[in-house]
Design a protein with these regions (language model features):
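Short alpha-helical hairpin
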Residues: 75-88, 255-265
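N-terminal mature-domain "stem" immediately C-terminal to a signal peptide or N-terminal signal-anchor/transmembrane
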Residues: 14-85
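Structured segments of extracytoplasmic/periplasmic soluble domains
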Residues: 37-41, 110-113, 117-120, 214-218, ...
Length: 322
C-alpha cells in the first residue's frame, strides 16, 4: 500500500456532487428538536417536568436515575441552564444552526445505505438540545442524543472548559455526523474482549473508522479520524516509518494496558514515536490495516463489524507499507 500525502476522497464522491437535498423527509431517522423546549424551562420544577416528559432520552443524557439521589442530580443539572450564560449559548446555537434538522441528512443517508445491505434495520431517533455543556453525545440502540452546544464553531465565545484543545478541535459542526455515527455504530462493533493484545484493539477501532468512512463518503477521512489536515498529511507521509516503529518495538502483541494507552488513547502527541505524531496513532494504523483487508474482501459492512477475530483481518490484509 502506498502512503498517501493528500486528503483521501473515496471513489464515487467529490465535493461537487455531494449536494444533499434537505427539503425531503428523513427516510431512516427521526429528529426531535428540544432546543426551544429546554430554553423555555424557567425553574427547577419545570426542568424536572421536562426531564420526565422525555425520560427515556434525557435521564441517561443527564445521568439521572430513579434513586434517592434523583433530586440532587436534577438540581445539579439545572444549574447548567439556570445561569446568565445560557441565553447567549441559546442565541449562538440558533445563529450557527439556523435549521438544525439540515445537519442530519447525511446521517439519514448513512443509515439508508447501511440498511440496504444489512440484516440490521437501524432507524434511531435523534434528539438535539442545548445541554449547558453537560454532555456531548449519548447513544443506545434506539437513540442518539446530542448536546448541540458542544459542536459550535471553534471560534465561538462559549465552548466546554474541561476539554484540552487537541480534543476540543474535534467538536465543530463538520464533526457532528461522524462522531454521532461512530458513537452509535460502536454498539454493533464486536471485539474479542478476552484478547488483550494491542492489535486486537487497533483492528476494532479500524473497523469502525472504515465503516463510518463508507457510510459518510462525502466527509473527509481526516474528519472521521479526528485529525487536522496537517496531522493527517503527516501520518500518511510517514506510514512506513510508523508501522516500522510498531514492529521494531514489538507493540502489536503488547498486552500492558499502560503501554497500549500510549498509542490508542487521547493524547496531544505520540511522544514515543515523535513529538509531531498525533495521539491515537494506533487507531489510525488499525484503519489502514482494515482498509487493506477490505480492498480484497467480500465482507459487507455489517459482517465487518461482526468480525471479532482480528487474526482473520490482520493476516489476510496483506498490509505492508514498508
Amino acid at each position: 500500500i502506498k502512503s498517501l500525502a493528500f486528503l483521501i476522497l473515496f471513489a464515487g464522491c467529490s465535493y461537487d456532487n455531494c449536494n444533499i437535498k434537505t427539503n425531503e423527509s428523513f427516510k431512516q431517522i427521526t429528529v426531535q428538536n428540544l432546543i426551544t423546549d429546554i430554553y423555555s424551562v424557567n425553574n427547577l420544577s419545570s426542568f424536572n417536568s421536562f426531564l420526565l416528559e422525555n425520560k427515556n432520552v434525557l435521564y441517561p443524557f443527564y445521568e439521572v436515575e430513579d434513586t434517592s439521589f434523583l433530586l440532587d442530580k436534577v438540581a445539579n443539572a439545572f444549574t447548567l441552564i439556570d445561569n446568565v450564560y445560557f441565553d447567549s449559548l441559546y442565541n449562538d446555537v440558533n445563529t450557527h444552526f439556523e435549521n438544525p434538522l439540515n445537519l442530519f441528512y447525511p446521517l439519514d443517508n448513512s443509515f439508508t445505505k447501511f440498511n440496504q445491505q444489512s440484516n440490521y434495520k437501524l432507524s434511531p431517533n435523534i434528539t438535539i438540545l442545548i445541554s449547558g455543556f453537560f454532555n456531548d453525545i449519548i447513544v443506545d440502540k434506539e437513540n442518539i442524543v446530542i448536546g448541540l452546544d458542544y459542536f459550535l464553531p471553534k471560534t465561538n465565545k462559549y465552548k466546554p472548559r474541561d476539554l484540552p484543545s487537541y480534543i476540543l478541535d474535534r467538536y465543530s459542526p463538520e464533526h457532528i455526523n461522524s462522531i454521532s455515527l461512530s458513537s452509535y455504530l460502536s454498539q454493533f462493533n464486536l471485539i474479542n474482549e478476552s484478547d488483550l493484545t494491542m492489535i486486537n484493539e487497533m483492528i476494532s477501532f479500524g473497523k469502525l473508522y472504515y465503516v463510518v468512512s463508507k457510510l459518510l463518503p462525502c466527509t473527509e477521512q481526516r474528519i472521521i479520524l479526528g485529525y487536522s489536515e496537517k496531522e493527517f498529511e503527516l501520518v500518511n507521509k510517514n506510514e512506513a516509518f510508523i508501522y516500522s516503529f510498531f514492529l521494531q518495538n514489538e507493540l502489536l502483541f503488547e498486552e500492558s494496558n499502560l503501554i497500549k494507552q500510549k498509542y490508542l488513547s487521547e493524547r496531544p502527541s505520540t511522544f514515543e514515536i515523535s513529538q509531531s505524531v498525533p495521539g491515537r496513532i494506533g487507531r489510525w494504523l488499525g484503519w489502514r490495516i482494515v482498509s487493506s483487508f477490505m480492498d480484497s474482501s467480500t465482507y459487507t459492512l455489517e459482517e465487518l463489524l461482526k468480525e471479532d477475530d482480528y487474526k482473520n483481518i490482520f493476516y489476510n490484509s496483506n498490509y505492508n507499507p514498508i
